């Protein structure tokens, strides 16, 4: 396994010089060609996907996981759209983001360049193969793809078609997209040790996967941790906004990382806002896990038919990423308490305040330490496309390099570029005597 990992990483590293200087128009042509190959090979892709579905059933994968694994007409069309959209994005490679002149006449600037070789580990959804490969390729990064063992046939045909498109346009560049076509976990461990060959790892999946990668890796890891997101409804909130925002953030799509898991309510809203909000959520099949105060408010005949969905919260509930129609509820006495709660239980992903008080809103924005912080809007907008950034690799909760949606630009890094005209530090050059001796003009 060590030899296999070393071989694939060496191949990916070798194409970086050619890839980094590839004309943006050529990159876009390749992406469009991949989209054409997906259209032309829909039946083949679905045939390979059927093999994965059978394997998934044989290892008793859950129905939800099998649903995520399925690739039909809709999913293939979605991949085609991703490729077409990425082709339209502005290429960040080579962009000079700033330039200035210092006292000695040096012109100093910053230029965006690729990260290098990116190792992406992901689970189930085969569309990630196309999404990750297209973003890495457009940003001139070589990528090593390692999908879940249950999707190996689908992922392989998708990566093979991508490599075919590259081969058709540029000789010797197909290793810009490498696919790990073996199921052994040891390969992942070996690739995570290859400092100098692999530049960064990006795990996309559950918390256990991300922790395992972070603890094993010798290379840099950009983490996309779980989304324990909260909304705080302040006592100066516009309640009409609050009802809809909370509903949207929990109910619209509960299985994603930017849906809320905790609802924090100011105690002044317990009598009026909370019973109505609770009824909206319960009628929408949401299970409520309440603290003492919010639980007591719901102990009347209006809620008798929902008794099975009204429970007392445990400490563990507030840390939990449910990814389901379950919501933990906490009441607080102040903005300070709300922010303390979010700091303790949140995952620094996306959090929101609903208030009409500008001072409170600005304080929340400044003090809540999350990748995305909202005022009077649903947390469900934390997404590359929704932010106007285009397709993304995920939502980074790290504080180094990239934070929030990791779109095309976030797959590059800045380096310094310096233009001079013979400047010397402290004007120290070759001594006159040595110049004369060696006859240097």
Swiss-Prot record:
Gene3D superfamilies: Aldehyde Dehydrogenase, Chain A, domain 1, Aldehyde Dehydrogenase, Chain A, domain 2
Protein's pathway: Amino-acid biosynthesis; L-proline biosynthesis; L-glutamate 5-semialdehyde from L-glutamate: step 2/2
Annotated GO biological process: L-proline biosynthetic process
Stretches that traverse the bilayer: none
SUPFAM superfamilies reported in the protein's UniProt record: ALDH-like
Keyword entries, A-Z: Amino-acid biosynthesis, Cytoplasm, NADP, Oxidoreductase, Proline biosynthesis
InterPro entries: Ald_DH/histidinol_DH, Ald_DH_C, Ald_DH_N, Aldehyde_DH_dom, G-glutamylP_reductase_CS, Glu-5-SA_DH, GPR_dom
Top-rank lineage group of the source organism: Bacteria
CDD domains (UniProt xref): ALDH_F18-19_ProA-GPR
EC numbers for this chain: 1.2.1.41
Catalytic activities: L-glutamate 5-semialdehyde + phosphate + NADP(+) = L-glutamyl 5-phosphate + NADPH + H(+)
GO (cellular component) term, any one: cytoplasm
Family: Belongs to the gamma-glutamyl phosphate reductase family.
HAMAP family: ProA (MF_00412)
Function: Catalyzes the NADPH-dependent reduction of L-glutamate 5-phosphate into L-glutamate 5-semialdehyde and phosphate. The product spontaneously undergoes cyclization to form 1-pyrroline-5-carboxylate.
Name of this protein: Gamma-glutamyl phosphate reductase
